[in-house]
Design a protein with these regions (language model features):
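ATP-dependent carboxylate-amine ligase catalytic core
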Residues: 3, 7, 12-23, 47-139, ...
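A conserved segment at the C-terminal end of the G1
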Residues: 25-29, 37-54
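Beta-strand->loop->alpha-helix junctions that form or flank phosphate-binding loops
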Residues: 59, 179-185, 194-214, 230-233, ...
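Short glycine/serine- and small hydrophobic-enriched flexible loop segments
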Residues: 107-114, 245-252, 419
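Nucleotide phosphate-binding/pyrophosphate-handling subdomain across enzymes
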Residues: 119-124, 132-145, 150-153, 163, ...
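Conserved catalytic-core segment of NTP-binding enzymes
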Residues: 127-201, 332-334
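C-terminal helical cap/extension that packs against the catalytic core
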Residues: 183-204, 288-294, 336-404
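Active-site-proximal loop/hinge segments that shape catalytic or ion-binding/gating pockets
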Residues: 410
Length: 427
């Protein structure tokens, strides 16, 4: 089943399951870009001895179980299958017609309930107001976070920032005491969230929209110097400010008890594959040959703009090689126009079917090629439909002629390349 927003189906399924979501203590995150990063910062900082910190983020990067973690470790496959089979049986016997995402969301809630998580960090799948994760009662949400909002999924959420913001702000429901929003959002976005918070008596904290020497100031722990943390890209500073605003609220209200040193050390060890992620990609399982690449899941205009800022800072005007696949239905111009220059080369490819998301597939590379040529972004375009062949072909270019390689356009592309990489390492 494709994307179908609404809370009626999942509400009924959870009732048959005993409403596990009503026993969870939740931090709920919405936004267009940066949600997964904020969730990872939160779950990493909250981890303490004897604590179980659940995290639910989508889409998964490598395996579907990556979406559901406790202390950043995926749900065991057997446990996932057992819960999933029970849910599928309930879904069928009661003719509920739940979507794949609703079944996955229920799997996460049931798992977190069973292991008695102290905190559950929950990322919205799409939008917010009618997203399956919003079945969680407002009284169970200790805090909500709103990351940068941009144009994406317009056919579901609306064609303007204000319309999209209203959907995202829908996670702020009655009983939510505190909300944090990324201060770099457009004024009309912040106004929508501010009005929502005022109507529902949720106190709003707007993060600092300026870099200010890469510092984060908190009431609980004082200042943090972000220069000491492994953050790639300006936008990660603003994502971290959302997470820190939420954590600061929890600390002030004695919902957590974490020292400044603990916060710093846990942030220093955060890894987020697929977001400005540098790796030596193993392209050949026989020779163990590797190729340095930069991988980023940028898949919309605002994410592409942030990626370009990083690329110009790192590489200046140096020509780049892009390896790209794009999910079918995505707007091409907002994604490609900021990225490509006439000096750049692009290799267009595909990703395979995505586990648990049968409606997702890649845009035909020929369609993307025609668009790029029509727009005149670059004439250096190649198509390689077999993803596993793309990077080996680049490895045979001499180091003198080799350009920096940037893999982007879709998290599904990043995930599939990581699967190939991991299988080569195992072999």
């Amino acid at each position: 089943m494709a994307i179908e927003l609404g809370l009626s189906r999942i509400t009924k399924l959870l009732e048959h399951l005993g409403n596990p979501q009503n026993s969870l203590r939740v931090l709920h995150i919405a936004g267009t870009n940066g949600k997964g990063s904020v969730c990872t910062y939160l779950s990493s900082v909250l981890q303490q001895k004897s604590c179980q910190i659940g995290k639910f983020t989508t889409p998964h990067l490598v395996h579907v179980t990556d979406s559901i973690t406790i202390n950043n470790k995926p749900i065991p496959l057997e446990r996932y299958r057992n819960i999933r089979l029970k849910l599928e049986a309930l879904n069928k016997s009661h003719s509920l017609k739940c979507t794949e995402f609703e079944l996955l969301t229920c799997t996460a809630f049931k798992y977190f309930y069973d292991v008695q998580c102290q905190w559950c960090v929950i990322e919205v799948g799409l939008g917010g107001r009618l997203d399956a994760t919003n079945v969680i009662p407002g009284a169970n949400k200790a805090c909500c976070g709103i990351t940068k909002i941009g144009l994406d999924h317009e056919s579901f959420l609306g064609n303007t920032l204000s319309e999209i913001s209203k959907e995202k702000a829908g996670i702020i429901t009655k009983g939510v005491p505190f909300t944090v929003i990324d201060g770099t959002n457009e004024p009309n976005v912040i106004k929508v969230v501010k009005d929502r918070c005022k109507a529902l008596e949720s106190k709003l904290f707007i993060t600092d929209p300026q870099l200010n020497g890469n510092m984060i100031d908190t009431k609980s722990w004082g200042c943090f110097d972000l220069a000491k943390l492994p953050l790639n890209g300006e936008y990660q500073i603003f994502n971290l400010r959302v997470a820190m605003g939420m954590l600061d609220y929890l600390q002030i209200n004695e919902l957590i008890n974490i020292t400044k040193n603990e916060v710093s050390s846990r942030l220093a060890n955060v890894e987020w594959p697929g977001r400005l992620y540098r790796m030596d990609y193993c392209y050949d399982k026989l020779s163990n040959g590797t190729l340095p690449i930069l991988m980023d899941g940028a898949h919309n205009g605002s994410a592409a703009t942030e990626l370009v800022k990083y690329l110009r800072k790192e590489y200046g005007n140096q020509p780049l090689t892009f390896v790209m696949a794009v999910t079918y239905g995505k707007s091409l111009e907002p994604l490609l126009q900021p990225l490509l220059r006439p000096v750049d080369r692009i290799i267009l490819t595909r990703f395979n079917n995505v586990e648990g998301m049968p409606w997702i597939h890649a845009t035909d590379p020929e369609e993307i090629k025609d668009f790029i040529l029509t727009q005149g972004y670059t004439s250096e375009i190649e198509i390689e439909n077999e993803l596993h062949q793309v990077l080996p072909s680049l490895a045979h270019v001499s180091k003198e002629q080799r350009r920096p390689i940037v893999v982007c356009g879709s998290l599904y592309l990043c995930g599939e390349l990581l699967r190939i990489h991991n299988s080569h390492l195992r072999n």
